[in-house]
Amino acid sequence: MALHGFLRGYRGYADTQALGDALKALQEEGLDQLPLPGSGQTLERFSRLAQVAGHDLRLCKLFEGHTDALAIIKELRCPLPPLGSIWGMWAAEPPYAKVRVRKAGQRLLLEGRKAWCSGAAVVSHGLLTAWDEEDRQQLVAVEMHQPGVTVTDQGWNAVGMAATGSVEVVFNEAWGIAIGQPGDYLARPGFWHGGIGIAACWYGGAQRLAEVLREQCGKRPEPHALAHLGAVDSALNSAACVLRASAGQIDQAPLADARLLAQQTRASIEDMTEQVIHHVGRAVGAGPYCKDPHFAQLMADLPVYVRQSHAERDLAALGELVAGEPSGSWQL
């Protein structure tokens, strides 16, 4: 309820700085302190992520990254982040952008370029994947306000999610500290829990789009729009059941390998999201696209956000896992 009330006070974000100000305000109110995955309240964590997504997907992108960074630092038993710090979590590894680290005493020196660093211009710290001298992946925490860090204006041309400022950052002899050991980022159980958290964000955006259609059908119950609403309800209801079940499984076995669970959940939520975009867009017509700024922004943002999935590549990975499962796993 506190989060819902807080978000009601914010309407519209002109740019990255406005998103950063809202994220800072959330942090100052303690609303960034989400239950950790596997703590027994994983569904509450997913619910809050979905709430922020339904409010504004661009703010959610920064909020999810900040809260994910806090969870990772806690999971890897590293020192608590500085009081009042705001974090970005950047783990994209396209072939053209790579950060290297080398040891310098108790700290690390960073060199290279990191792609798609959402909120880089407005966060105080970044948690990012880099590669050490033995070509092992290493998580590194970096203070952003130092001479060796340059936040560029390059790397993002999409209209959707533009205000997230997901630009490239260049590191030139920047200082950082290791978070965990090499390989820990992907090896920890929370990696897959975080992937389901992103799916909860997709869910929140899709749910908000569906509410626009529900409101329209309540005022004008036109048969074709009602058919679209029925399809949307079916998809959302199924997706909600999947997220609730996933949260329960994480809480029951927080240290278990959750890769299969995450791949299944993300595939389900992605499919639902695409169905909602399709049905809502066809049902509401041009009016909301042209006259409802929140709806128009969501319709621009959600297809971009959901592309954090790797589409058929992820489905192929899921199929490979399922092919190795014993028969009978689909029985009730």
Locations of regions flagged by a protein language model:
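C-terminal helix-coil-helix/basic helical segment that borders enzyme active sites and/or dimer interfaces
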Residues: 6, 11-16, 20-24, 238-270, ...
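Glycine-rich flavin
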Residues: 11-122, 323
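Buried hydrophobic positions in well-ordered alpha/beta secondary-structure cores of metabolic enzymes
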Residues: 110-112, 140, 171, 206, ...
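DPxDG-like acidic metal-binding loop motif
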Residues: 113-146
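Glycine-rich beta->alpha junctions and the first turn(s) of the following alpha-helix
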Residues: 157-238
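Generic structural signal for well-ordered, non-transmembrane alpha-helical segments
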Residues: 204, 230-237, 263, 267-274, ...
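Short, charged, amphipathic alpha-helical segments
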Residues: 226-231, 256-264, 293-296
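Glycine-rich phosphate/cofactor-binding loops in nucleotide/flavin-utilizing enzymes
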Residues: 287-332
